[in-house]
C-alpha cells in the first residue's frame, strides 16, 4: 500500500493528465478508481481530491465547468478537458 503523500500526489496528477487526454469531461471519481487500483492508502484520498487537478487547471489544460456530478452518493466537481 502506498502511504507516502508525495508519491500519491504524483500518481493522482498522472491519472488526471491521462484522463484529460482520453475524456472530454472528468471528475475525481475517475481518479479515485485509479488510486484504488494503484494501491494508494484511502486516508490520502480527500487531500488528493483537492490537489490533483490544480496543476492541469493552472496550465490551462482543464476548465472548471462549475457543475457537479454525483457518483455513489457523493458529488464531485466536473472539469472539461481542453486537450481531449
Regions found by a protein language model. Name each.
Residues 57-68:
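A short, conserved structural fragment
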Residues 13, 28-29, 33, 50, ...:
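Short amphipathic alpha-helical segments
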Residues 22-39:
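Short acidic, hydrophobic short linear motifs in intrinsically disordered regions
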Residues 67-84:
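Short, cationic-aromatic polyanion-contact patches
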Residues 1-25:
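Short alpha-helical segments that sit at the start of domains
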Residues 42-58:
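Short amphipathic alpha-helical interaction segments
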